[in-house]
Regions:
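Proline-centered loop/turn at the N-terminus of a beta-strand
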Residues: 8-10, 27, 34, 185
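Generic structural signal for small/hydrophobic residues in well-ordered secondary structure
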Residues: 14, 35, 39, 52, ...
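Active-site region of PLP-dependent enzymes
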Residues: 18-24, 31-158, 194
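Conserved PLP cofactor-binding pocket of PLP-dependent enzymes
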Residues: 71-86, 131-136, 175-215, 219-225, ...
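Conserved PLP-binding active-site segment of the aspartate aminotransferase-like
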Residues: 148-149, 157-168, 186, 195-202, ...
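Generic C-terminal helix-cap and adjacent flexible tail
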Residues: 246-255
Length: 255
């Protein structure tokens, strides 16, 4: 943040998967000028479908943020008989019409109840991740999930596993095929942004960007994958750990 302020840069903190996490004793999503959380159905806690929260440390934007939530309506003023006014939101490039980002009361209630359980939910995820890390740490061809420390408290949205191709006898693509054959779900969807078709349509040169990002290419194409762990039984976690170790063993033996 100090570097951003030095260069007058606004920091937008994407904390979509990180509700309840901490960095240096500060809650994730509250460090930047703006922070956003997602409560889509695949996140750690949900609002029964879509939903999110936008936070800000920039007080002058708060009135605009509140009005942007629902058609530019100022709910601090009395609205008789639902005869509300649609006002413009003042943006950098001029006024624009707000859309409807409001949610239902049922969704709001469901989210509130889950927020009250966030520590319990994260702890369950942490225990599952801790078990896998303990099982997998004995294999020198694997880099298990980092479990954090006193200054870094993850939310364990997914279990991130990296392999070392030189030691594993193959890269992550071969590993994924073996895990698929064993019926273990993987979620490797965090791809480099420059690989999205929309950026090609905007005229970005995917090949040129890829050549300038060799580490990103190596990690995505050859080294990492993710596993869902929340709600798995001890027997299912056992099976997952066994499948991972067996797959690496097969790769090393060339079978």
């Amino acid at each position: 943040m100090a570097l951003a302020k030095q260069h007058d840069i606004v920091v937008l903190e994407d904390a979509a998967h990180a509700f309840g996490g901490e960095y240096k004793h500060r809650k994730l999503g509250t460090i930047g000028d703006f922070g956003s959380f997602s409560f889509h159905e695949v996140k750690n806690i949900t609002s029964f479908g879509e939903g999110g929260i936008l936070c800000s440390n920039v007080t002058e934007f708060l009135p605009e943020m509140r009005r942007a939530r629902f058609l530019g309506t100022d709910f601090s003023k009395h609205i008789p008989n639902w005869l509300y006014d649609v006002t413009a939101i003042r943006g950098k490039n001029g006024p624009f019409v707000a859309t409807n980002f409001s949610t239902t009361e049922i969704q709001g209630l469901g989210l509130q109840l889950q927020i009250a359980r966030i520590d319990q939910i994260i702890e369950a995820r942490r225990r599952a991740s801790e078990y896998l890390t303990k099982r997998l740490s004995a294999c020198d061809a694997l880099i298990p999930q980092d479990l954090g420390n006193d200054e870094i408290k993850p939310t364990f949205h997914l279990y991130q596993l990296q392999i070392i191709p030189e030691k594993a006898g193959g890269d992550i693509q071969l590993f994924k095929k073996k895990m698929d054959a064993k019926g273990v779900t993987q979620i490797p969807h965090f791809g480099p942004l420059y690989k999205f078709e929309i950026l090609r349509e905007y005229g970005y040169d995917e090949k040129a960007i890829a050549e300038s990002c060799p580490v990103c290419e190596e990690v995505f194409n050859h080294r990492f994958t993710h596993f869902p762990v929340y709600g798995l039984t001890p027997e299912q976690l056992d099976y997952m750990a066994d499948a991972i170790l067996e797959s690496v063993d097969e790769m090393q033996r060339g079978v």
